[in-house]
């Protein structure tokens, strides 16, 4: 059975490799112009990492003459990481689902807020922030791939790994999301492999030598078995490590969640890998790069022109060098011409800066990274800057929705699964049933802030028509404070619950009634201010 599974997995892996190799030239072009210092595709083809060529320390960006797209890609990644998962902040909030009864909702939300604290306590301690930026750099071009491994200790339960784009491949399943991942490890030290996969089985043909470091090639494969159900989920995850030369199954385990996470910013229907914003802007970047290259070549010819020379018995064109303060011995011909003359210029390329700036603006518009006006620009106002930022956020909203589905969902599932196995996560039960944890991402939190602002505008509208005193009758005031706290992601422990607010409001009403009665008994006309400043009612 193991041999059959290995043969089947190797066949699937080779098919996925062939599919990704079809993207090789497009990846090469896009990485070259958007991330020149991360472009491995010029040095080694897909599927040959890193045995074909070692690029460590090499200058792989010398052929890029304009860095507009490279800078825009950096800004795009920085902005999206700061917007969706900023370092040191709780950018995600666990909330109760619609199945929870209203009387239990506040209690459950407080418990879930404590789970949020536990989640970020260990996430911020891990290397997540170091890895997520690298993955989003790949997502800017096509697809980001992250591995979430279980740590060795309870103090550090998470280990995150970014995967090089040339050595990981994926397959889409029947639900339109990735359900199989293949990661190549070429020339991996055997000692490192044994740490990565405990109880790793040694391939049959491998012999360890104390004098030499043993290097090995392994295929790391994870796929979803849709025939094995896991509760209401479509299938369990099968994790395998295979030695391709001997077809040895070196390691295996079954998981409830996926150790690999792959996400795309946007994609074309029917394709496996994404087409990110950098891929959209690469045409303009390529035009600028070629234009500047042509201008540099043209300027070189103008500054250092080519010369034609012929031998006149004194001057030898085969061994002369044009060096300042050098005397060239030559004899003029009878016609008075010299044996050395510059080649006439055959053409002159002059690109207008206006055209180049228009192309740069196209790149910034595609990447939503238009630079802000200078601080001392008299034409720029604070309102203009705020509106531009808001427009960029709205334009990225569709991208954020896909990231929320393909990245945040699997990430939270995997991290909770690891915390549960480590004994660091307590599940919540209501009426004897385990509730499923739901969460709000920064996109939802931003929408919540907008809803609170809209509510305040409505309150001001009602107050303007009916007056401040009468406006409170239009709302369930005991619900406003908890509602706004949830929308603004405020700690619920410092917010009074609805029953407490109702009791407090009732006490205020009773106090008003008592003061009115006392004023009436003392003969004070209604509406006359008392010593405490309250009017008799």
Identify the role of each PLM range.
Residues 98-102, 126, 267, 341-342, ...:
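Generic signal for short, ordered secondary-structure residues
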Residues 104-151, 272-308, 344-378, 385-419:
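Long, contiguous amphipathic alpha-helices that act as assembly "spine/axial" helices in icosahedral shell
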Residues 1-210:
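Extended, helix-rich architectural segments
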Residues 1-35, 39-40, 46, 306-537:
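C-terminal anchoring/interaction modules
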Residues 7-8, 12-14, 149-324:
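Structured, contiguous alpha/beta core segments that scaffold functional sites
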Residues 67-83, 280-298, 457-461, 482-486:
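Short, hydrophobic/amphipathic alpha-helical patches that form generic packing surfaces
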Residues 98-105, 263, 315-320, 369:
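Short low-complexity stretches enriched in small and charged residues
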């Amino acid at each position: 059975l193991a041999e059959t599974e290995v043969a089947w997995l190797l066949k699937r892996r080779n098919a996925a490799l062939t599919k990704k190799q079809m993207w090789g030239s497009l990846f090469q072009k896009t990485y070259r112009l958007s991330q020149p210092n991360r472009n491995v595709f010029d040095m080694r083809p897909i599927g040959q990492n890193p045995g074909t060529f070692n690029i460590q320390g090499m200058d792989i960006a010398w052929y890029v003459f304009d860095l507009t797209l490279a800078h825009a890609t950096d800004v795009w990644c920085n902005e999206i990481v700061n917007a969706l998962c900023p370092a040191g902040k709780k950018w995600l909030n666990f909330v109760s689902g619609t199945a929870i009864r209203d009387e239990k909702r506040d209690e459950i939300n407080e418990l879930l807020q404590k789970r949020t604290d536990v989640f970020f306590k260990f996430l911020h301690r891990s290397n997540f922030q170091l890895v997520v930026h690298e993955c989003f750099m790949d997502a800017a071009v096509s697809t980001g791939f992250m591995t979430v491994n279980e740590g060795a200790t309870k103090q550090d339960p998470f280990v995150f790994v970014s995967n090089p784009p040339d050595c990981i491949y994926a397959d889409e399943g029947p639900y339109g999301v990735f359900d199989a991942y293949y990661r190549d490890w070429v020339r991996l030290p055997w000692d490192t492999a044994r740490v990565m996969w405990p109880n790793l089985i040694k391939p049959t043909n491998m012999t360890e030598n104390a004098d030499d470091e043993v290097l090995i090639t392994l295929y790391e494969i994870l796929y979803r078995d849709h025939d094995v159900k896991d509760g209401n989920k479509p299938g369990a995850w099968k994790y395998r490590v295979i030695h391709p030369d001997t077809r040895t199954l070196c390691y295996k385990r079954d998981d409830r969640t996926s150790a690999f996470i792959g996400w795309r910013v946007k994609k074309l229907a029917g394709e496996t890998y994404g087409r990110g914003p950098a891929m959209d802007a690469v045409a303009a970047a390529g035009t600028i790069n070629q234009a500047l290259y042509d201008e540099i070549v043209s300027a070189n010819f103008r500054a250092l022109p080519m010369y034609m020379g012929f031998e006149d018995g004194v001057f030898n064109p085969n061994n002369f060098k044009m060096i300042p303060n050098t005397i060239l011995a030559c004899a003029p011909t009878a016609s008075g011409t010299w044996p050395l003359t510059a080649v006439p210029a055959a053409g002159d390329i002059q690109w207008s800066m206006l055209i180049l700036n228009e192309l740069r603006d196209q790149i910034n518009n595609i990447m939503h990274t238009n630079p802000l006006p200078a601080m001392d620009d008299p034409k720029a106002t604070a309102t203009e800057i705020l509106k531009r930022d808001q427009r960029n956020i709205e334009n990225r909203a569709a991208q954020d929705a896909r990231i929320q589905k393909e990245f945040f969902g699997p990430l939270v599932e995997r991290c909770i699964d690891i915390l549960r196995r480590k004994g660091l996560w307590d599940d919540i039960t209501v009426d004897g049933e385990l509730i499923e944890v739901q969460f709000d991402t920064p996109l939802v939190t931003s929408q919540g802030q907008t809803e609170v602002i809209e509510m305040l505008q409505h309150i001001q509208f009602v107050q303007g028509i009916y007056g401040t005193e009468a406006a409170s009758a239009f709302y369930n005031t005991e619900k406003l404070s908890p509602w706004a706290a949830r929308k603004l992601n405020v700690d619920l422990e410092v917010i009074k619950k609805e029953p407490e607010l109702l009791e407090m409001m009732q006490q205020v009403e009773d106090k008003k009634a008592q003061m009115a009665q006392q004023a009436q008994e003392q003969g004070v006309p209604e509406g006359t201010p008392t010593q405490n400043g309250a009017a008799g009612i």
